[in-house]
Amino acid sequence: MIDENHPMRAAGNFFGRRHGKPLRPHQSNLFEDLLPRLKLDLATPAPQDLRSLFEAPVETVRMEIGFGGGEHLHHESGRYPQSGFIGVEPFINGMAKMLAALDQAPRPNLRLYDEDATAVLDWLPDASLAGIDLFYPDPWHKRRHWKRRFVSDANLDRFARVLKPGAKFRFASDIEHYVNWTLQHCRRHAAFDWQAESPADWNDAYEGWPGTRYEAKAFREGRRAAYLTFIRR
């Protein structure tokens, strides 16, 4: 039965390949031992107070979708120990890098999920997140694949449901078409405001931004990034 309060998940995947290079033995062990301790259990109802998901006492909860190798998420969760973080990454090698970082420097304010982010969004209570980050998502360059882009009307509806009023949706990309696509979708959505006042508001990286390996590669190849911030009304 379909829950009429939640949008249906799209039939197609929003992500590409699940696996790249073979995992080393230690990485495989982390998937067996560490990930089960950190992974959200969507088979049980989400707590109305998401702060109870974390070992550490936290004040607010944020979510990063598609964290890649985890550079930003690991950095932010260490920088803001008073905030809880939910990180979602279906790409196995990216999750392996994140688990290795957590093995060396644990984060009691961090939980993970290694499958479809829309399942997490549909599981979360209304107005439960202080922010959502979506950095360098797969742009799905071919026109016939644009429907797989994570920024869509259906997913913005999901964001609007789980974000608190005044919460931020942050989006970064080095693909101009995807940047424009996101601007168009968010600016026509009734729940979001884009409050940029000058080019610096999208040309300059976010305060405290650590950069990522993907971003560094894009810069080496001559591409520039845009950093967009939308506010939940």
UniProtKB/Swiss-Prot annotation:
Gene3D superfamilies: Vaccinia Virus protein VP39. It holds the Pfam family Methyltransf_4. PROSITE patterns: SAM_MT_TRMB. InterPro entries: SAM-dependent_MTases_sf, tRNA_(Gua-N-7)_MeTrfase_Trmb, tRNA_methyltr_TrmB_bact. It catalyses: guanosine(46) in tRNA + S-adenosyl-L-methionine = N(7)-methylguanosine(46) in tRNA + S-adenosyl-L-homocysteine. S-adenosyl-L-methionine binds at E64, E89, D116, D138. GO terms for cellular component: tRNA methyltransferase complex. SUPFAM superfamilies: S-adenosyl-L-methionine-dependent methyltransferases (SSF53335). Belongs to the class I-like SAM-binding methyltransferase superfamily. TrmB family. This is tRNA (guanine-N(7)-)-methyltransferase. The gene is trmB.
